[in-house]
């Protein structure tokens, strides 16, 4: 494949990446006070790209979160809890109690589709 074919492939991958971006804000369950059964859904503000559910003993926190802060140290510091389980996800209303119990998943379907597309494109480029 020549330079022109590589440019076309890059352009197609760029278009795919743009279309994979949903264009709407993420919806998460969000309860200002810890509860065991949060049913309040909100549209997350700009910059909050992840839903969080965290459990510290009997306290369960559901809220919009920043993926960059989805680690034990940041979560425990911001929630002021020293021991907790947590789960971050990037799909609408994905932060419900069963996610902590089942272990959940961390990759969205869009992410998987994009990764598979990139792998297939790379394999196609490397094929003689």
From Swiss-Prot:
SUPFAM superfamilies: Snake toxin-like. One of its GO terms (molecular function) is complement binding. It is found in: Cell membrane; Secreted. Keywords: Cell membrane, Disulfide bond, Glycoprotein, GPI-anchor, Lipoprotein, Membrane, Secreted, Signal. N- and O-glycosylated. It is a lipid-anchor; GPI-anchor. The keyword Signal applies. GO terms for cellular component: plasma membrane; side of membrane. A lipid is attached at residue 102 (GPI-anchor amidated asparagine). Glycans are attached at residue 43. Potent inhibitor of the complement membrane attack complex (MAC) action, which protects self-cells from damage during complement activation. Acts by binding to the beta-haipins of C8 (C8A and C8B) components of the assembling MAC, forming an intermolecular beta-sheet that prevents incorporation of the multiple copies of C9 required for complete formation of the osmolytic pore. This is CD59 glycoprotein. It comes from Chlorocebus aethiops (Green monkey). The lineage of its organism: Eukaryota, Metazoa, Chordata, Craniata, Vertebrata.
């Amino acid at each position: 494949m020549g330079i022109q074919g590589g440019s076309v492939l890059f352009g197609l991958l760029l278009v795919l990446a743009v279309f994979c971006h949903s264009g709407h804000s993420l919806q998460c369950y969000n309860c200002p006070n810890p509860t065991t059964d949060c049913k309040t859904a909100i549209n997350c503000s700009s910059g909050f790209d992840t839903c969080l559910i965290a459990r510290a003993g009997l306290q369960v926190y559901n809220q919009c979160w920043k993926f960059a802060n989805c680690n034990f140290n940041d979560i425990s510091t911001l929630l002021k809890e020293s021991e907790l389980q947590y789960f971050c996800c990037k799909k609408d209303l994905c932060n419900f109690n069963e996610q902590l119990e089942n272990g959940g998943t961390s990759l969205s379907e869009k992410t998987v589709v994009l990764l598979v597309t990139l792998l297939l494109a790379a394999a196609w480029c490397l094929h003689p």
